[in-house]
Amino acid sequence: DEGIITAPITAVVRKGKERFVCDARLAERASLVQPSRKRQTNSLNIAAHILDMDHIPELSRYDRCRICVPQSCPRDCFMRLDCRYQQYLRDSMKPDIQICNHNYLLADASHRLEDRPLLLRSYQALVVDEAHKLPDAARQMYTETLSPHNMDELCLLLQQAHYKDFA
């Protein structure tokens, strides 16, 4: 009524790629399933229409692992031009509000530092689900730990480099 907001506000929930269906992997997996396995066949058929695996009923953990988007998509993928996941990535940059969890935010920060493609569009406001886990996740991601074995190796290297005071 006041004319402050002139268009609908849009939002998208961002998730890691392991939560989405890879159509190429789905086709391969579906071809291996026996038709007599009705529940499994049904879940895989639903996956052909629903990209987000969290919304596919009765999808087994095994099939979820077999049909999810891989860590890196092959450049020669036969589904590249029609890939639902790639389309989702393009479309998810458009909404006004990005919603993600702490791990996705840290992954985006890592991409920005390494000049890799952004996971989140440039934002002025961001909703972070599970934000209370952010400090621990960042600490775990950006902290190096040395085991006693690592320390022994380091001492040996220092000794070999004639730094006897440190060994």
Language-model features and meaning:
Residues D1-Q98, H102-N103, L156, Y163:
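A substrate-engagement module of RecA-like helicase motors
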Residues F78-I97, H102-A167:
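Signature of the SF2 helicase/ATPase Hel1-core->accessory helical subdomain module
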